[in-house]
Amino acid sequence: MLMPKRVKYRREHRGRMKGRAKGGTEVHFGEYGLQALEPAWITNRQIEAARRAMTRYMRRGGKVWIKIFPSKPYTAKPLEVRMGSGKGAPEGWVAVVKPGKVMFEIAGVSEEVAREALRLASHKLPIKCKFVKREEIGGESNES
């Protein structure tokens, strides 16, 4: 499971997810990618479930890149605890994903296999996603 080795602070503010992703909106490493269409927190368990779904479908072929990392801790208070008395204990880790971010990339397989693998991965995530090719994003090719 993905998580930071060490962090400066155990608890973080929730923050806001306004606007579109600044970077990571194009397919750089692989040939095909899975692009987020909505803002969300993606947990390390969801990332791992999506990775397993992709690699199981592709069997031995292809390479997968995970372009998001769960670096933000989220906290939760125990059940039936009254309000107040401090912030809850760290519960897990999330990656903040904004619309336009390419979360996963695949190379070394045919387009049909990549499309199906990324479709299976998208069902493990709590947001709407889009299949993108390397040359499609932005309307022109990436070679220039």
UniProtKB/Swiss-Prot annotation:
Pfam families: Ribosomal_L16 (PF00252)
Entry's Gene Ontology cellular component terms: cytosolic large ribosomal subunit
Biological-process GO terms, alphabetical: translation
InterPro entries: Ribosomal_uL16 (IPR047873), Ribosomal_uL16_bact-type (IPR000114), Ribosomal_uL16_CS (IPR020798), Ribosomal_uL16_dom (IPR016180), Ribosomal_uL16_sf (IPR036920)
Gene3D superfamilies: Ribosomal protein L10e/L16 (3.90.1170.10)
Record SUPFAM superfamilies: Ribosomal protein L16p/L10e
Single GO term (MF): tRNA binding
UniProt keywords, alphabetically: Ribonucleoprotein, Ribosomal protein, RNA-binding, rRNA-binding, tRNA-binding
Family of this protein: Belongs to the universal ribosomal protein uL16 family.
Job description of the protein: Binds 23S rRNA and is also seen to make contacts with the A and possibly P site tRNAs.
Quaternary state and interactors: Part of the 50S ribosomal subunit.
Protein name: Large ribosomal subunit protein uL16
